């Protein structure tokens, strides 16, 4: 969209500035506005610049002639009168908001005097053409819901803490109620927020507000597992209410299969193994009582050690330890020859026998060619003499 100048005004901006009175900017600064009253240096007052105005210099850096001949219709106005300039712009393409393709310039009031009534009518007509109907705006954007006033939100006295340790200033509710008519609740929608400034020493007593977090059943830590002995004892008490008062039944020892080598002598002498197995038909003896206790679990079938992963029970703690390695994948025993790892030491020992057999075979193969490659020894003929 291009604009064409319909009427050229023979007036420059310098003429507008030259109409300002000299007493508009006083040379003396009032004492109330003096910012350097406390300083020792005297304040230097600046006089008005007597040089040419900036607006007087054109684009070609040529100073215009201050005395221009104006027509009769453009005479300089007196000091306190309104200067009104009118003009028109014409546009090529028509638009909806300007049917006549002509825009009238509004009148400019220089010294605060209200402009003419004709200029006001021009501005009003132009604004009414640009602004949409009020009904359409209300239909598109509904009105905000009313909120309560500020005084209703803060009914209790409010105190503000000073970080330097000064006592807080308390404000009574009457101060807020007196200022209530001056505020409009529709203009300032208020949301209550009680998180005021607090001293750093008082931050520990303020509860921390966290947003609601959904319960994820996967991330919730499971409760600790109840020992198996406690569960069994609780079940037995439910079945037999007087379980605690009844005497314990005698320990029954189940017979086990005989040893593979019953007559094999033990390395430990007999007098050093005082703890004998009380089971019938078992001739095992032990040098320590804990060894006897562990052995008796074979007869009783007691397995106090349970795996928490697969709930499998064991009679010995070392058996449970090696079993857990099957779940974790831990293999602490490595072979000295090939570096292969095992979860149990007996497995590594059994694997090491394979390397020992291979080593013996290599030694046998290496010794056989040396014996065959040796030159045959010629045997001297035995001469027998007859007497």
From Swiss-Prot:
Query: What Gene3D superfamilies does UniProt report for this protein, alphabetically?
Result: Classic Zinc Finger (3.30.160.60)
In the UniProt record, does the keyword Mitochondrion occur? no
The residue ranges flagged as biased composition, category Basic residues, are: 350-360
Its subcellular locations are: Nucleus
GO MF annotations, alphabetized: DNA-binding transcription activator activity, RNA polymerase II-specific; DNA-binding transcription factor activity; DNA-binding transcription factor activity, RNA polymerase II-specific; RNA polymerase II cis-regulatory region sequence-specific DNA binding; sequence-specific double-stranded DNA binding; zinc ion binding
Chief location of this protein?
A: nucleus
Q: Tell me which residue ranges form C2H2-type zinc fingers.
A: 275-299, 305-327, 333-355
Composition-biased stretches, type Basic and acidic residues, lie in 269-283
Low complexity bias: start-end ranges? 368-387
Keywords, sorted A to Z? DNA-binding, Metal-binding, Nucleus, Repeat, Transcription, Transcription regulation, Zinc, Zinc-finger
InterPro entries the record matches: EGR_N, Znf_C2H2_sf, Znf_C2H2_type
GO annotation terms (biological process): cell migration involved in sprouting angiogenesis; cellular response to fibroblast growth factor stimulus; cellular response to vascular endothelial growth factor stimulus; circadian rhythm; endothelial cell chemotaxis; muscle organ development; negative regulation of apoptotic process; neuromuscular synaptic transmission
> Region Disordered: which residues?
241-283, 348-387
Record carries keyword Zinc-finger: yes
Tell me which GO cellular component terms the UniProt record holds: chromatin; nucleoplasm; synapse
Tell me its family: Belongs to the EGR C2H2-type zinc-finger protein family.
Name the job this protein performs.
Probable transcription factor involved in muscle spindle development.
Q: What is this protein called?
A: Early growth response protein 3
Q: Which source organism does the UniProt entry give?
A: Homo sapiens (Human)
List the gene name: EGR3
């Amino acid at each position: 969209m291009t604009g064409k100048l319909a009427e050229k005004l023979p007036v420059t901006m310098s003429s507008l500035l030259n109409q300002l009175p000299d007493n508009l900017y006083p040379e003396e600064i009032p004492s109330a506005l003096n910012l350097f009253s406390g300083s020792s240096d005297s304040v230097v007052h600046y006089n008005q610049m007597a040089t040419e105005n900036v607006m007087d210099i054109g684009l070609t850096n040529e100073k215009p002639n201050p005395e221009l001949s104006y027509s009769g219709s453009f005479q300089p106005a007196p000091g306190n009168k309104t200067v009104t300039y009118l003009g028109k712009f014409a546009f090529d393409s028509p638009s909806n908001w300007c049917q006549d393709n002509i825009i009238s310039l509004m009148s400019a009031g220089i010294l605060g005097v209200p402009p003419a009534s004709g200029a006001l009518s021009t501005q009003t007509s132009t604004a009414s053409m640009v602004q949409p109907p009020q009904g359409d705006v209300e239909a598109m954007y509904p009105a905000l819901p009313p909120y309560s006033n500020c005084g209703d939100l803060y009914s209790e006295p409010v105190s503000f803490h000073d970080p330097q340790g000064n006592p807080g200033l308390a404000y009574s509710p009457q101060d807020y109620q007196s200022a209530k008519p001056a505020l409009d609740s529709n203009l300032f929608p208020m949301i209550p927020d009680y998180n005021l400034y607090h001293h750093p020493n008082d931050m520990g007593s303020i509860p921390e507000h966290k947003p609601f977090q959904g319960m994820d059943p996967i991330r919730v830590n499971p409760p600790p597992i109840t020992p198996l002995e406690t569960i069994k004892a609780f079940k037995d008490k439910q079945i037999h209410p007087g379980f605690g008062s009844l005497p314990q039944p005698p320990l029954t020892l189940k017979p086990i299969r005989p040893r593979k080598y019953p007559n094999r002598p033990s390395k430990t002498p007999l007098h050093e193994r005082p703890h004998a197995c009380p089971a019938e038909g078992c001739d095992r003896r032990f040098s320590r009582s804990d060894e006897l206790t562990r052995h008796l679990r074979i007869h009783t079938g007691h397995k106090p050690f349970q795996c928490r992963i697969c709930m499998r029970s064991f009679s010995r703690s070392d058996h449970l330890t090696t079993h857990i390695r099957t779940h974790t994948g831990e293999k602490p025993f490595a072979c000295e020859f090939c570096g292969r790892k095992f979860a149990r030491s007996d497995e590594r020992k059994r694997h090491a026998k394979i390397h020992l057999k291979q080593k013996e075979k290599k030694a046998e193969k290496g010794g056989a060619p040396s014996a065959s490659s040796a030159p045959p020894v010629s045997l001297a003929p035995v001469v027998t003499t007859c007497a």
